């Protein structure tokens, strides 16, 4: 379990989100110990794990690869003739972020995060899990908004992670502005081992109504085969193993797809 924590890295800009991530990772370690040995961890066991987590989950501006140096904007003040052309406030110096390689030395060896980005050390994402932004509004009705979750998925795949698990709108099955190529690639991707579909988004997000429902998928680099597809509709789950692109148009409901398949086999379609 300690090695698993040592191998888990991540950064976050917002301090409150960082705190939540650290707490959740520490709780995961404690829950594992409870499940494995049927006891709670001691303070002596938690202290080194907390130290590892404080190093491995850090606060960083991902665009600058540095410690966030911003501060809240001051309240608007009335300008006067003598202050409006004053000297610009100097920017704080950039502070590099450091991470530790816990496999080197008894207490790990620290190195600048930039050196990892520059390729001096190979960096690979084992798992990518999340809920990416869904769309960008173009000022019109929501139906005309431009999806952007597809861009996140395409970018993530270029990093060749071991596995991806993302929850996104299900509208891409048959619609969505500018999603034709994305739809074709997703339906033909045999690395998608699992696709779980919720016809009603309220089953997942009680306070958010996403038109067309939502879905989450599991993409595995080492997998190549049929997809385990589950559809939730009116509280009932139906699961089948299928090729997502078996029909020219994706059929969402397994019962309907079986009917179409049967009709095609009988030569009546």
Describe every region a protein language model picked out.
Residues 1-195, 200-204, 209-216, 220-234:
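SAM-dependent methyltransferase catalytic region
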Residues 207-269:
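Flexible, glycine-/basic-rich loop-and-beta segments that form/coincide
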